[in-house]
Amino acid sequence: MAAHCILFSSPAATTSLIFPISNPNTAVSLPSSSFHGVSLKSTINRQSLTLSAAASAAPKPLTVFAATKKAVAVLKGTSSVEGVVTLTQEEDGPTTVNVKITGLTPGPHGFHLHEFGDTTNGCISTGPHFNPNGNTHGAPEDENRHAGDLGNIIANADGVAEATIVDNQIPLTGPNAVVGRAFVVHELADDLGKGGHELSLSTGNAGGRLACGVVGLTPV
């Protein structure tokens, strides 16, 4: 004899009840329920409206960040030499460096970006020139140069050096970002790697470190 059953769905418990029937002609008394088709339809309609409203909600506007980045370094030393260096970069373009340093002897002075922003032992602890590509020292316009090779700044008769430098190798963001590194102004002129001295290809034979300052981001 084939088995017969009635499948009864209970909306209150969200389960299905199966009642076996040995005799298909036997009347079966189903559990009583307060379920009404109209109520179910109303619930579905409300859910549909909610989902439809969520799907049609307007997307949130994107946040746009400023493309201009700025940084500053305040240079101090053991002597009277001091100064301020500001850096500005537009999007992924070159970085513009504005320099003003006072207390120098008149004439050229080597000006470099050094690898570390560590001044715990004065300017000597800023380490070597920033050189992520492992090149020898050179002039700013040379293809083979340290990224931190920024040439010379020239102090006038009053000991004030002002300069604007535009350079592609000292970005404010990315893997070679200069933030957290240090600018150093030197005692002597940088020979730009061409002086023939044993230090020409490492430091430009620019002499001692007069003042230094760590690069930090500033508000745009």
From Swiss-Prot:
Destroys radicals which are normally produced within the cells and which are toxic to biological systems. It catalyses: 2 superoxide + 2 H(+) = H2O2 + O2. Belongs to the Cu-Zn superoxide dismutase family. Pfam families: Sod_Cu. The keyword Chloroplast applies. Disulfide bonds join C123-C212. It comes from Solidago canadensis var. scabra (Tall goldenrod). PROSITE patterns: SOD_CU_ZN_1 (PS00087), SOD_CU_ZN_2 (PS00332). Binds 1 copper ion per subunit. Cu cation binds at H112, H114, H129, H186. Zn(2+) binds at H129, H137, H146, D149. One of its GO terms (molecular function) is superoxide dismutase activity. The gene is SODCP. Keywords: Antioxidant, Chloroplast, Copper, Disulfide bond, Metal-binding, Oxidoreductase, Plastid, Transit peptide, Zinc. Its cofactor is Cu cation; Zn(2+). It is found in: Plastid, Chloroplast. One of its GO terms (cellular component) is chloroplast. Residues 1-66 form a transit peptide. It comes from the Eukaryota. SUPFAM superfamilies: Cu,Zn superoxide dismutase-like. This is Superoxide dismutase [Cu-Zn], chloroplastic. The lineage of its organism: Eukaryota, Viridiplantae, Streptophyta, Embryophyta, Tracheophyta. Homotetramer. Its EC number is 1.15.1.1.
